[in-house]
Regions:
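Glycine-rich hexapeptide-repeat left-handed beta-helix
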Residues: 1-105
Length: 105
């Protein structure tokens, strides 16, 4: 959670990552619907608003801005700007298959 700003009563569940460096080490920009806003920084985590809850093992990518009173569910990988009072859930399809050739080693 380096180089990040956490609001009053913001909560990060176990294993949450607020990433602060891009993989290619280039300048971090905040991505908005109106375009990117350059920060001039190579290390910049996230801004997390007051009373926001981020669930276990979520990953918040560099330059993300999370509004106040938001909820990000466990396992979400988020990048961008999340408006105040928003909620993000991960939708995934699980496929359960039967195992064949189950034997003792």
């Amino acid at each position: 959670m380096g180089d990040s700003i956490l609001g009053y009563h913001a909560h990060l569940g176990a294993g949450v990552i607020l990433s602060n460096v891009k993989l290619d080490h280039s300048e971090i920009a905040v991505s908005t619907p109106d375009g990117d806003i350059p920060t001039g920084l190579r290390k910049f985590g996230a801004i997390v608003g007051d009373r926001t809850e981020i669930g276990c093992n979520a990953v918040i990518n560099p330059g993300s801005v999370i509004g106040r009173d938001c909820m990000i569910y466990p396992g979400v990988n988020f990048r961008g700007v999340l408006p105040h009072g928003s909620m993000v859930k991960l939708l995934q399809d699980l496929q359960v298959l039967s195992r064949r050739n189950i034997g003792l080693a």
